[in-house]
Amino acid sequence: MSSASKCPFSGGALKFTAGSGTANRDWWPNQLNLQILRQHSPKSNPMDKAFNYAEAFKSLDLADVKQDIFDLMKSSQDWWPADYGHYGPLFIRMAWHSAGTYRIGDGRGGAGTGNQRFAPINSWPDNANLDKARMLLWPIKQKYGAKISWADLMILAGNCALESMGFKTFGFAGGREDIWEPEEDIYWGAETEWLGDQRYTGDRDLEATLGAVQMGLIYVNPEGPNGHPDPVASGRDIRETFGRMAMNDEETVALTAGGHTFGKCHGAGDDAHVGPEPEGARIEDQCLGWKSSFGTGKGVHAITSGIEGAWTTNPTQWDNNYFENLFGYEWELTKSPAGANQWVPQGGAGANTVPDAHDPSRRHAPIMTTADMAMRMDPIYSPISRRFLDNPDQFADAFARAWFKLTHRDMGPRSRYLGPEVPEEELIWQDPVPAVNHELINEQDIATLKSQILATNLTVSQLVSTAWASAVTYRNSDKRGGANGARIRLAPQRDWEVNQPAQLATVLQTLEAVQTTFNHSQIGGKRVSLADLIVLGGCAGVEQAAKNAGWYDVKVPFKPGRTDATQAQTDVTSFAVLEPRADGFRNYLKGHYPVSAEELLVDKAQLLTLTAPEMTVLVGGLRVLNANVGQAQHGVFTHRPESLTNDFFLNLLDMSVTWAATSEAEEVFEGRDRKTGALKWTGTRVDLIFGSNSQLRALAEVYGCEDSQQRFVQDFVAAWDKVMNLDRFDLA
């Protein structure tokens, strides 16, 4: 062995580098994953701390960018020739697959972060050859730099593609800020092989939150369930997967038909010719995957899905030909050159009606996938499809609206939309709230209102738990929920078990009386919204709890400006998915789940953008404030509830207490005096994890020290303020 291959310190061979070798999770695979609370830190972000993407985007001349995209789409490149001389269909697929990962269950996925650039999404089988689309766009991204994110550029390119082929879009909004590392928090499934479907149990019951039928797909298998060409069964899969991304039946038909009006499928040969995906490709391939040895590997020889052919006679022009073909022919099952199941007109009908994508001397018959056939054969989709066939204007409007929803669903409220093409129409799925149309309360008013709230019969626990319930619906994944709008007083939130409807009604009635008295006393236009008053009540409760603990100078920040949404502005079905099935901060768990309560706590904390220290201090603080659902005493490790003390940590870390589960389920535990056996406390897994997990115990020890009381109060107030304002995009 040469000296160059020897480690300079030990003389042994250098086999691994920093970060390599057996990891903790290899030894303890069930270890609580706190890494998802440390994602996207400034250490991974190359931009300056002062960089403001919204301001950078506003400096962009969007018309210039669009013109560059228009020009690019018709400039075919030899290294990846454009089908029909137009990259528009490829860009539509790229944008669709960027947005189409969104699912309503947890709001994760979607186009909002540009995550198609990273694993695993950049290497999913369903995203084959979309690496070429991004590489084609690189000169435009390079030209405009930080002024437009990849996330925005991919969606804008899809819109430009539609416009360049004769379609009038509903609009476009910028404001999607790029991430710089994969999103490790998103659960895409437990399968270990591409296209695995262990996510199904029983009679094809799809695992909760997942929005695709197989690992590595966006929605459904185009050949049918597990490749079986059954259009009716495919329709059931389509309805479930599209429904899980917030699309109804009409939107589903419009999106399917609208997207398949353009471009073609690629299956010129056996996929055995196709090389590894980008993440598995060679270093010299430079992030390009799926290199094919079939012929030239591109153009007429391209292999992507394995299905081969186009749906319409003019694949680069918006028209109604998709439906004309779907209902104009009778279809029969056949195989593509790659061996994939697809459908062609019976008896050779339609031959020579579709141009070849690259060879002007060749023509073809149209094709349909099994998923397309569901648009005709599914008993619900079929009448919608026939209506669109007979009413092209309805189809165009439905597709425009559904495409806008698809590509903007995870952006949150309209206040985050940027650019000159933001549509004026307010849409119910945007969770609208009224604009502020009154003078806001000032510091003197805030002090007066806090005194009036504390003078009522409401307890610290009631004030804190109501404010928390109002704010904690927020999820950063799709920017939905939060305290703005005061939707906790509306259906469905007012009836959620976790919100303690009876107590909630009492608190709201009391706060409404305070609101009415204050507003009626104003001579001018000054008003306080109930949304603001709910949060202010929580802040007043925290301040009172601090005083109860001997901290008289604590002031919880409060920023007015929330407004009250109406029931008409609130889609009950859409908001139902925000109902917390588990909220470890309130020691609440509805039902039983395959995952542990502590994992659900971390999941919730990640959606709230909390760090591990913030999660820790909030749990400890909310416990001593007696904010559990139903005022359950699990985890209330204090003899002075409603006082903002660090007692939770002091007593959890007390070695004179020994813990044991109360049942085989190991969900509730009793803490008994180690010597006498006397019962001292009860707690849940969410409580005990802060003493059991070594990382969380280290944080608990910080707050359990004798000199940490002031730090605890300060950190709790800061974390509380953060949660109360997560949906205040107007403050950014």
From Swiss-Prot:
Disulfide bonds: none annotated. The keyword Heme applies. GO terms for biological process: cellular response to hydrogen peroxide; hydrogen peroxide catabolic process. GO terms for molecular function: catalase activity; heme binding; metal ion binding. It holds the Pfam family peroxidase. Its cofactor is heme b. There is a cross-link at Y219-M245 (Tryptophyl-tyrosyl-methioninium (Tyr-Met) (with W-96)). The record marks R93 as: Transition state stabilizer. Formation of the three residue Trp-Tyr-Met cross-link is important for the catalase, but not the peroxidase activity of the enzyme. Heme b binds at H260. It catalyses: H2O2 + AH2 = A + 2 H2O; 2 H2O2 = O2 + 2 H2O. InterPro entries: Catalase_peroxidase, Haem_peroxidase, Haem_peroxidase_sf, Peroxidases_AS. One of its GO terms (cellular component) is cytosol. Keywords: Heme, Hydrogen peroxide, Iron, Metal-binding, Oxidoreductase, Peroxidase. Coiled coil: none annotated. Binds 1 heme b (iron(II)-protoporphyrin IX) group per dimer. The keyword Signal does not apply. There is a cross-link at W96-Y219 (Tryptophyl-tyrosyl-methioninium (Trp-Tyr) (with M-245)). Its EC number is 1.11.1.21. The active site is at H97 (proton acceptor). Bifunctional enzyme with both catalase and broad-spectrum peroxidase activity. Homodimer or homotetramer. Belongs to the peroxidase family. Peroxidase/catalase subfamily. This is Catalase-peroxidase. It comes from Acaryochloris marina (strain MBIC 11017).
